[in-house]
Amino acid sequence: MKTTLFCFGRTAACLTLAVALLTGCSLLPAASPRKDPIPVEQPSNASAALDDGKLRILYDSNGSTVLCGSKVLHEGRGDETVALVYDPAESDIPYYWVAWSDNSSPSGRRSALYDKTGAEVLTFEQDHSVTLSGNYLVLNQTDALEFSCDHAVQPGDCRVIDLTTGQELPSPDTAYQCVVSNDLFAFTCYERPETLADGEYDEDMYQHVRMVLQDREGNPLREEDRCTATSLSTQNNTSGIPSDWILLDFYTDGYLSQSSTLSNTVTGEELDGFDQVCGNGTASFRTEDGQYQLIDLASTEQSEVLATFDRSVLYHAPGAVVCWNAGNDYRYQFHDLTTGEMKPVYNVDADDKTLAVYATDGTLRVYDRTTGAILTDVNVDSVENQDSAQVWAVGEGYALVMLYPAGDHSKPTIRLYDAQGLVRQLAISASTPDGYYYFAPLTTTDGHAYFRYGYAGPNGKTLYDVLDENGNAVLKGLALCYSYYGGNGLNDLPAGAFMARKGFYYGWMTPDGQWLYCRSIFASSTDEHGYGDLI
């Protein structure tokens, strides 16, 4: 693998830009015609458990609700797009974004950025895909150009605003997306050929893209043809990788990148052969001889090779690695970096805190992804005795294993394990018809694990029971039931809470059936009701 050093030139950051750069946006502008948020009544059963000052969105296809703690800031309409705006590297979500239809706007859409009080911060005359990097608000083109590429990029499709000063920074006229790293700005530009008519599909789009790296004043520091720049936050398991690293994809022909390079905007170090991020500040890189290196990108200023493997690395916890093993009788390889032990793995699962490894010899281990500590080490059953199996890292040291006997996939054996071994072999609820077809982890709290259990209800509608770790149904007949996914774990619901719909209400519920916050399915601000169909 080639490692090169590239030193970026720097210019003193400009603290003040021309007012003309602010065309189309302003700090604390006059109220827009949208007149948001719409006043709504807070349900009387809103729980004090939500009074934590965190922004959350209760999604509904006909109008989503934005809350800060238990206070309702905004009730949306069906034509709106609502999203949280945050920096994954920070510990708070400070803003939310609303875009809506407006025929008076040249684009047919307007949008605005709001803070945690519901105050309007900035307004725009079109919709954008919005990200936050430190104090920089990045407005990218809403529609992913890669999936349309039938029109030219217009000036203003990609913008960068310093929220500290309210100043808009220079951006290339043909830029459609930007990645911010250490006060440097990597723009991806699309130079559409003039020979193509508007609406004509560009089959060679990636032959016409260009990466431009600029400082705050717009001075170009580096340019690369047939190259795109993206943030590692678009990859999986990026916890712990500094924002110093940006991903550069290079294209020679077609839509698949021919090479991928991680570039460090602070040190100038570049690492070729990027494969994927692996968690805990590491990533996998393919070398020129076909090997794969696990490289630590976070512990020191320069990268450090931790180990080399003959397969691509999928997951990493300190002292433990899981590699892909395509083409053999088993799917994965487990490597103990301390003892050198290697064993075939049938299935594996990870969340942001734990890594569950189910080996073909029947051993099941759960690792802490931060410390590498073994939370659970038990024997389940050899894969040779099963037709197939699934494993989940449930949380709080739990691991869930579903074993499917040969010839009968209708009733798998469901086992829950913790550090002491088997907690319970879960039985199908007696109240559930034989139409059972879905079982998955739901939430954990206070040392207890809960699962959602789907089955066919009346008129073919799917209903859900909530089961505890002992297999007891603590809630029955929910119309919807699933985990809440918010802003990268920054605004998780209070422990144990999840998304649910029961009767004519939908919202956030606890395992004892209490609503933390709920809304009536008839509370939509439009004439058409989504009846709580959450998206």
Language-model features, listed with the residues they occupy:
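Short, conserved catalytic or interaction motifs in soluble domains
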Residues: 27
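Intrinsically disordered, low-complexity regions enriched in serine, threonine, proline
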Residues: 7, 31-32
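Residue-level detector of conserved, function-critical positions
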Residues: 33-535
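Bacterial N-terminal signal peptides that target proteins for export
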Residues: 2-13
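N-terminal processing/targeting junctions
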Residues: 14-16, 169
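C-terminal motif of bacterial Sec signal peptides marking the signal peptidase cleavage site
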Residues: 23-24
